[in-house]
Regions:
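Residues at beta-strand starts and edge strands
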Residues: 9, 38-40, 50, 84, ...
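Residue-level signal for short segments within beta-strands and strand-turn junctions
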Residues: 56-60, 105-107, 130
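Aromatic- and glycine-rich beta-strand/loop motifs that create alpha-glucan
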Residues: 53-93, 113
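Bacterial Sec-dependent N-terminal signal peptides
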Residues: 1-25
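Non-catalytic, glycine-rich low-complexity segments
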Residues: 23-51
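Extracellular fibronectin type III
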Residues: 108-126
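Single conserved hydrophobic/aromatic residue that forms the stacking wall/gate
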Residues: 127-136
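Short beta-strand segments enriched for Tyr within beta-sheet-rich domains
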Residues: 44, 54, 96-105
Length: 136
């Protein structure tokens, strides 16, 4: 009987450890929404409460990872949203320009007042926006 209790304890401990260390994932997206001449909204869903952002660059032939790209966060009144669903509106886009973008979600492990503890980051592959000629 003692052996069975120990076996169950070890099994439960193993399962609990696996659940606690499961990595955050992007489940759906990115989706381009409300695309206009100089703005677009990028939407995606993560599997854990997280903050989200988009990194964006024009498709100008430079290496995307050769320099740091601007980050556009999912915010409300300047505060980063903690959510499963992320929507980032990117403004001031140059008409006629094709862009490359990548979405990110960073898990929020704890958020008490101004104290936030972040976890792991999930990111998608690099996407390229449709050519302006293809959207007419």
């Amino acid at each position: 009987m003692k052996y069975i209790k120990k076996l169950i304890y070890v099994l439960l401990l193993t399962v609990a450890t696996q659940v606690a260390t499961a990595q955050i994932k992007i489940l759906y997206g990115p989706y381009l929404q409300n695309v206009k001449e100089n703005e677009a909204t990028i939407v995606w869903v993560a599997d854990k409460p997280s903050i989200g952002w988009v990194e964006l660059a024009p498709n100008d032939g430079t290496h995307y990872y050769g320099e740091e790209r601007p980050k556009y966060f999912d915010t409300t009144n300047g505060v980063k949203n903690t959510s499963l669903l992320h929507a980032v509106k990117v403004k001031a886009l140059t008409p006629g320009t094709t862009y490359r973008y990548r979405i990110y979600s960073q898990e929020v492990l704890s958020h008490e007042g101004i104290n936030v503890i972040y976890g792991r980051v999930a990111a998608c592959l690099l996407y390229t926006s449709p050519s302006p000629r293809d959207t007419r």
